Amino acid sequence: MGRQIEELAAFVAATRWDDVPAPVQHHTRLVLLDTLGVILAGSERPEVRALRDRLAATAGSGATVYAPGWPVQDPRTAALLNGTAGRAIELCEGLRLVSGQAAMQVLPGVLALGEHLGRSGREILAAFVLGYEVAARLAGGFTPRPLAHQNGQALLLAAAAAGARLYGLDGKGISRAMRLAAVLLLTPSYTNAVAGATALNIAGGMSGHAAALAPELALAGFTAQEDAIEEALGQLVGSAFATDGLLDGLGARWEITRNYFRLYACCNPIHPALDCLSEILAELHPRPDEIARIEVATYRFASVMKNPDPPNYFASKYSLPHAAAAMVVRGHAGF
C-alpha cells in the first residue's frame, strides 16, 4: 500500500474545520453555494425529472433531493440524483490545473450523508473541503486514457474519502473505503458529450452514490487489495498514476482556492473564445444580421468541439459554434 495514500487518508481523518484557514473556509462556502445552485438548475432538465420520478417509486428517506418540492430519498439515491442534476447543464466549477469537476463529484454525497447522519454544518464543510483536497491531489497524479472523461474516475475516490470522514472512520478506515471504491470506478467517454449522450451525467452522479456506499462497505467488513488505487488509476481506467507529489504542501496549500467558476454553461475549453467574443461584441455592438462569420483560433482540445448543428441540448454544451452563436443572438451563453 502506498505511504502517500495512507497519509492522505490520515489527514482527512484528523483535520478539523477549525484547522482550515479562514480564507479557505470562506472560499469553500462560495464553492458549496455555487455548486448547490448548479444542482438546483440542473434538476429541471427533463431527463433528470424523469429519473427522479422513476426512483421515487422505491423512495427511501433521510436525505434531501435538491429539486422543486424538496423530495427525500435514501442517501445513496439522493446523492446520485443531485450529482446527475449538477452535471446536466455544464455549469459546474472545476480544477484549474488538471481536468476534473471536484465539487460536483464530492458535494452531493457529502450533503446526503451529512443530513442522513445528522452532522453539523461545520462537519459537512470539513468533509467537503477535505474531499476536494483529495480530489485535486489524486487528479494531479492521474493520467487518464485519451478518450476518458474524468467523471467517476479519480474524483470518485475522493467522494468516498469524504463520505468515510462523515461516518467517523479513522485514517485506516478512510483508506479502506477509498480502496474499496476503486472497484466502483467508471469508464465514461468524452465522445458521449459531443454526441449529446446524457449518460455522461450519470457518471457524475455515481461519485455521489459511491460516497455513500463505500463507507458502508468498509464498515461491513469488505476488504480491498493494498494497491487497489494505484492499480486502478495507473493500469485500468488510466495509463499512469504518480504518487510522488501527492502530499506536497498538504495542510498549507488548499486546492479548493485554486479552482475556477464557470460563467458560461458549456465545456470549459470553449470559454476563452467566448471571453474574446464578449469583448469584441461589447466594443463593436454589431447586430446578429451584420455578422457573416466568426473565425476562431484555439487549441486542439477545443477545436474538436466544432459541430455547428448539435443534435440536442446537451451536445450544444460541447459546440463552440453553437456557444458563439448563442452569445451573439442572446447576449450570453447561459443554460
Q: PLM features: what roles do these ranges have?
A:
Residues 267-335:
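Intrinsically disordered, low-complexity Ser/Thr/Pro/Gly-rich interaction regions
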Residues 1-260, 300:
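N-terminal core-entry segment
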Residues 263:
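Acyl-CoA/ACP chain-elongation machinery
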Residues 99-102, 152, 266, 313, ...:
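Aromatic-acidic/polar surface patches that form glycan- and anion
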